[in-house]
């Protein structure tokens, strides 16, 4: 099977004490990789590599199920999810399971079911992983040619790509079906403070859906992260699912064009680098989404966004001082600008003070108070509802600014509580993991290109001093 590279060039690493851990066909002598290089030993053993991937999927699903049940066991219905350090239950609640008006949890049984289903699935995957790693055929090409492959077989690789794209498309449509037919999803914009509803009037207009991609990523534009209604989100999944499925069929039925055969590197390590690059992009986009977007990630479950907590503070003190007799329309702040209200660069009436930088914020508790020219003074004087006051006071004291030792909230906010927002956790983890994946992409892309060009950078291993020394064992 070693048809692509000379072992000496492609597997330059020599390590000691390898003999004791040798497995037939998976030791350093036969693969060029030591035990610690993990799946690199299985580059040409498709059956064993299948086992490694299935077992890895089992570990992922086991974590999901176990963590899900852990969160259910610790969940206190009287407290908001974001005060309890939960990262999985908010996702289930966003999908409309177990919640009612205002995001209140009315039934935790669906969460329990989700955890148990994932645990059962992980057992099946774990068994399959162990079977293929230890008992199944080492290579699939002979017994199961459909599942076999050679890394440089361009046609087979694009067929595998097509199958993956179809699976991703089906995944996108699962969300669409949940929103349309299976109980709906949670809409933070539903009147009166959010509720679960079926999405009936999908946005399928390509100018709207693809218009998001053409927006600037900065300021009030916010690229795709600026999406703020569920019709657009679910409609976008219809488009995405359709494109993935059609693209998958295309890649299964066609062979790569000549320009693609020339431009791309066709090796296992190259495919690894492409995948890491794609995952890195996903990580960075997810980071921005969970940090800024309060429609796909409702604040009832994930806590307020940073801009939302800041605007909530301005709103809370406007309400308080207005009750104490302040004229919020004309009061002047220490800088000579409006203390409570001022104008944005484009003329809208916005909150004054430090929160002016977040004037683009849109949030369901605030939008009813806006008119055609920004915040409406008469509505601020007459129309503020108790639920809006309660929600903004809650969000003011739960800003997503927290350190790892759980001293959460704004440093100067005397009413803040000790907590770290799930938005902080999810945004930080996805940024850091996205960055690591990007470094891995650069590393493996460089190695794959070097191998394809016929050279490897590094020490000349043929004359390394350590080779003449006594083995450690």
Swiss-Prot record:
Propeptide part(s) removed at maturation, as residue ranges: 1-14
UniProt remark on cofactor binding: Binds multiple chlorophylls and provides some of the ligands for the Ca-4Mn-5O cluster of the oxygen-evolving complex. It may also provide a ligand for a Cl- that is required for oxygen evolution. PSII binds additional chlorophylls, carotenoids and specific lipids.
Any one annotated GO CC term: chloroplast thylakoid membrane
Protein name in UniProt: Photosystem II CP43 reaction center protein
Family: Belongs to the PsbB/PsbC family. PsbC subfamily.
Pfam families: PSII (PF00421)
Modified residues (Phosphothreonine): 15
Positions annotated to bind [CaMn4O5] cluster: 367
Membrane disposition: Multi-pass membrane protein
Subunit structure: PSII is composed of 1 copy each of membrane proteins PsbA, PsbB, PsbC, PsbD, PsbE, PsbF, PsbH, PsbI, PsbJ, PsbK, PsbL, PsbM, PsbT, PsbX, PsbY, PsbZ, Psb30/Ycf12, at least 3 peripheral proteins of the oxygen-evolving complex and a large number of cofactors. It forms dimeric complexes.
Location of N-acetylthreonine modifications: 15
Protein task: One of the components of the core complex of photosystem II (PSII). It binds chlorophyll and helps catalyze the primary light-induced photochemical processes of PSII. PSII is a light-driven water:plastoquinone oxidoreductase, using light energy to abstract electrons from H(2)O, generating O(2) and a proton gradient subsequently used for ATP formation.
TM regions (residue ranges): 69-93, 134-155, 178-200, 255-275, 291-312, 447-471
One BP term from GO: photosynthetic electron transport in photosystem II
């Amino acid at each position: 099977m070693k048809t692509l590279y000379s072992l000496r060039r492609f597997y330059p690493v020599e390590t000691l004490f390898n003999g004791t851990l040798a497995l037939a066909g998976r030791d350093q002598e036969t693969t060029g990789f030591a035990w610690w290089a993990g799946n690199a030993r299985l580059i040409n053993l498709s059956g064993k590599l299948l086992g490694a991937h299935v077992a890895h999927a089992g570990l992922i699903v086991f974590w999901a199920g176990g963590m899900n049940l852990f969160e259910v066991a610790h969940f206190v219905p009287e407290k908001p999810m974001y005060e309890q350090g939960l990262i999985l239950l908010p996702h289930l609640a966003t999908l409309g399971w177990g919640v009612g008006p205002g995001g209140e949890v009315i039934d935790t049984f669906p969460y329990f079911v989700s955890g148990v289903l994932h645990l059962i699935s992980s057992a099946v995957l774990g068994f399959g992983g162990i079977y293929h790693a230890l008992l199944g055929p080492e290579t699939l090409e002979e017994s199961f040619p459909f599942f076999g492959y050679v890394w440089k077989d361009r046609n087979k690789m694009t067929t595998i790509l097509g199958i993956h794209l179809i699976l991703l498309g089906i995944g996108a449509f699962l969300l669409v079906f949940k929103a349309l037919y299976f109980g709906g999803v949670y809409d933070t914009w539903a009147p009166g403070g959010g509720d679960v509803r079926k999405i009936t009037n999908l946005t399928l207009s390509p100018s709207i859906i693809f218009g998001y991609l053409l927006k600037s990523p900065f300021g009030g534009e916010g690229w795709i992260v600026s999406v703020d209604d569920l019709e657009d989100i679910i409609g976008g999944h219809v488009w995405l699912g359709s494109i993935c499925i059609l693209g998958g069929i295309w890649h299964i039925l066609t062979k790569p064009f000549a320009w693609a055969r020339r431009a791309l590197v066709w090796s296992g390590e190259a495919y690894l680098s492409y995948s890491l690059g794609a995952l890195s992009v996903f990580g960075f986009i997810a980071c921005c989404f969970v940090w800024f977007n309060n429609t796909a990630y409702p604040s009832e479950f994930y806590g307020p966004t940073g801009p939302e907590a800041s605007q909530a503070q301005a709103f809370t003190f406007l309400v308080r001082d207005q009750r104490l007799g302040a004229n919020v329309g004309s009061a002047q702040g220490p800088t000579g600008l409006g203390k409570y209200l001022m104008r944005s660069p484009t003329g809208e009436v916005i909150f004054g003070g430090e929160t002016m930088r977040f004037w683009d914020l849109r949030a369901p508790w605030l939008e009813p108070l806006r008119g055609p020219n920004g915040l409406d003074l008469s509505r601020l004087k007459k129309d503020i509802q108790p639920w809006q006051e309660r929600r903004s006071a809650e969000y003011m004291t739960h800003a997503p600014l927290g350190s790892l030792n759980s001293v959460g909230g704004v440093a100067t906010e005397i009413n803040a509580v000790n907590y770290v927002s799930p938005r902080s956790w999810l945004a930080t983890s996805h940024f850091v993991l996205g960055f690591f994946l990007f470094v891995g992409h650069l590393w493996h892309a460089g190695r794959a290109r070097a191998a394809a060009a016929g050279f490897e950078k590094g020490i000349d291993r043929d004359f390394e001093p350590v080779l003449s020394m006594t083995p450690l064992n």
